[in-house]
Amino acid sequence: MTEPPAVDRPLRRVAMISLHTSPLDQPGTGDAGGMNVYVVELSRRLADLGIAVDIFTRATSSALPAKVELVPGVTVRNVAAGPYEGLSKNELPAQLCTFARAVLRAEAIREPGYYDVIHSHYWLSGQVGLLARDRWAVPLVHTMHTMAKVKNASLADDDVPEPPARLLGEEQVVEAADRLLANTDEEAHELVTLYGAQPAKVEVVNPGVDLEVFAPGDQAAARRAVGVREDAIVLAFVGRIQPLKAPDLLIRAAARMLERQPELRDRLVVAVIGGPSGNGMEHPEAHAELARRLGVDDVTRFVKPMPRPGLADWYRAASVVCVPSYSESFGLVALEAQACGTPVVAAAVGGLTTAVTDGVTGLLVPGHGVDDFADALAAIATDPGTRETMGKAAVEHAQGFGWELTAQTTLAAYRTATETMAAE
C-alpha cells in the first residue's frame, strides 16, 4: 500500500472518476447532462490552478483512443469495461470490478503516490473510488450529483424507482468517503438526514456557469440564429428527455396557455432542446404525440442537443426557460439561462431553489400542476416589463456562480481531506 501523502506536500494530481458518462459526450444526449458539464468545467479550472487531472471514464466505442487531452493539464482516459455499446446505466454495476481493475493498473505503472486525491462523481464512480482509496492511501472526495432516496421520494407518474443496489452503494460511499461535496445547503442536509453522513465531512460547493459562453446578447440576433420570428413568445426546455426532467409538463402548460389566450398561437414557439435519456429513440416520439394530441404540434419544435454556443443562442432567444424537474441537485440549465439574461420558471425542488431567486430572477412553482406552470410561464412570457426586470436580475445573480470559484472551493476541500488523512 502506498504511504499516505505528507501533510505539507502540495497537491499536484487528481484522479477524477466519471464511470457512467464521458466528459467527451454531448450534454443532453443519452446519460450525458449536467454532471458532464460539471466534470469538464471543474477539471479545466483545476488545470488553470496548476492541478493536473486524469478523468477515468468507461469507453463506449472501440474507436476511442485510450487517452484524449481535453485541454492542457486534463486527460480523459477511456477504460474498456464491458461491451462498448448498448449497456444501460442499470447494467453498469456488473462492470465495476473490470473498470476498477483498469483504474488501479493505470496507477500501478506510475511512481508511488502519483495521485494526491481521488474525486468520484455519482455512486458508481464512488464504488471504484473506495477501492482506489484503500489501494493508493489517498483521500476520496465524492460528489453525489443525484441521490436515490431523494429521487424515489418525488417520482414522476411514469418514472421507476431507483434499485436497492444503488441505495446500498450510495450508503457505502457516504460512510467511507473522506469528504462529501454537496451542491447546495439542501443537499448537504439530505446527506446528513437521509444517509447519516457525518456533518463535519460535508462541504457545500456550488456548481458554476461559464460566464464567457453564457452571457447576455442581442435577442433579435439570437432569434434570427435559431430561426424564430422577432416578436415570438419562446418557451424553452433544455435537457434530457426523461420523466425526471418533465418536458411533457412544458408542452401541457403551453397548451393550457393557448386555451386561455388563443391569440398567442401565431407567436408561440415551444422549443424542447435535448435527446432521450439512456439508449432511447433519437426522436422523442411520445412527446411529439403528446403535442399532437393537445393540438400544439404546430408550435412545438424538437431540437437536437448542440454545442454550447448554439445553446446560448437558444437561451437568449427564449422569453422564458422552463425547468419543471421532479428532482434536481442543482439545475445548471437554470443558471445558464439566467447568465444569458433569460428568466426561469422552475419547479420548487432541490437545488433549483438555490439556482433561481423566486420572484426576482424567475418564478418557483410548488408542485407540478399544469395550471400553475401555465400561470407562471404566462406571467413572464407575455409581460415585456417583467421579462426585462427579471432578466437583468438574472444576469446579476448568475455572476456569483463562476466555475473559477467552484474550482477554488473544491481545491480547498481536497487540501482539507489530504491534511486530515495525513494527521490520522
Curated annotation (Swiss-Prot):
CDD domains assigned to the protein according to its UniProt record, in alphabetical order: GT4_sucrose_synthase
Record keywords, A-Z: Glycosyltransferase, Magnesium, Metal-binding, Transferase
Residues annotated to bind 1D-myo-inositol 3-phosphate: 20, 31-36, 89, 122, 146, 166
EC class: transferase
Binding residues for Mg(2+): 315-316, 318, 342
Organism domain of life: Bacteria
Pfam families for this protein: Glyco_trans_4_4, Glycos_transf_1
Residues where UDP-N-acetyl-alpha-D-glucosamine binds: 26-27, 34, 240, 245, 306, 328, 336
Catalysed reaction, written as an equation: 1D-myo-inositol 3-phosphate + UDP-N-acetyl-alpha-D-glucosamine = 1D-myo-inositol 2-acetamido-2-deoxy-alpha-D-glucopyranoside 3-phosphate + UDP + H(+)
Annotated GO MF terms: acetylglucosaminyltransferase activity; D-inositol-3-phosphate glycosyltransferase activity; magnesium ion binding
Keyword check for Metal-binding: yes
Example GO biological process: mycothiol biosynthetic process
Protein EC: 2.4.1.250
Function as written in the Swiss-Prot or TrEMBL entry: Catalyzes the transfer of a N-acetyl-glucosamine moiety to 1D-myo-inositol 3-phosphate to produce 1D-myo-inositol 2-acetamido-2-deoxy-glucopyranoside 3-phosphate in the mycothiol biosynthesis pathway.
Quaternary structure annotation from Swiss-Prot or TrEMBL: Homodimer.
UniProt xrefs under NCBIfam families: mycothiol_MshA
Protein family: Belongs to the glycosyltransferase group 1 family. MshA subfamily.
Protein name: D-inositol 3-phosphate glycosyltransferase
Organism per entry: Kribbella flavida (strain DSM 17836 / JCM 10339 / NBRC 14399)
Gene that this sequence comes from: mshA
